[in-house]
């Protein structure tokens, strides 16, 4: 079972980002992978919706002890009893690879956690937010520091993002 995490901003998001997130979720499901996310709103909700529309399985790694914040498209809600930042660590550790759609401060934390834990991240650059800016601040455009622990990947389309994520997962199995 392949598990792909989707990270991106919560709250209200522009319609273009809604559509991209939904397309990411749909493509994850069509490729036979399980979608993992923080399970609440924003990018997480639209990605979950896209996966459900394609009959995919959606897991929400939720903050707190209740399912009150879970979006309507979550099949398996997992309450962590943790704050948003700590539940993100569980999301990162539970994912085989992650796709970054847009993003704010919390998404940067998830990106950093993924890098520290050697998890492949594909950054969907046209989605705006930090996804559009990471390359400009990354070390040699591809790393979060000079140790070059794991290369960040960039994609211009959703299909390209999934192709890269799945190939990185396959390489990590070897």
Segments the model singles out, each with a brief description of its role:
Residues 2, 8-12, 81-159:
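C-terminal binding/interaction regions
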Residues 25, 158-163:
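Short, amphipathic alpha-helical "lid/cap" segments that border enzyme active or binding sites
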Residues 165-174:
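Short, hydrophobic alpha-helical segments
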């Amino acid at each position: 079972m392949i598990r792909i995490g989707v990270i991106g901003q919560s709250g209200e998001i522009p319609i273009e980002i809604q559509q991209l997130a939904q397309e990411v979720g749909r493509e994850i499901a069509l490729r036979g992978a399980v979608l993992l996310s923080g399970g609440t709103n924003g990018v997480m909700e639209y990605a979950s919706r896209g996966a459900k529309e394609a009959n995919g399985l959606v897991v929400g790694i939720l903050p707190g002890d209740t399912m009150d914040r879970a979006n309507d498209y979550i099949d398996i809600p997992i309450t962590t009893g943790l704050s948003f930042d700590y539940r993100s660590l569980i999301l990162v550790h539970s994912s085989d690879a992650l796709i970054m759609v847009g993003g704010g401060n919390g998404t940067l934390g998830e990106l950093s956690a993924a890098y520290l834990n050697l998890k492949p991240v594909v950054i969907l650059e046209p989605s705006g937010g930090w996804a559009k800016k990471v390359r400009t601040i990354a070390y040699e455009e591809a790393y979060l520091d000079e140790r070059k622990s794991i290369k960040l990947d960039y994609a211009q389309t959703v299909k390209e993002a999934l192709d890269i994520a799945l190939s990185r997962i396959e390489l990590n199995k070897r």
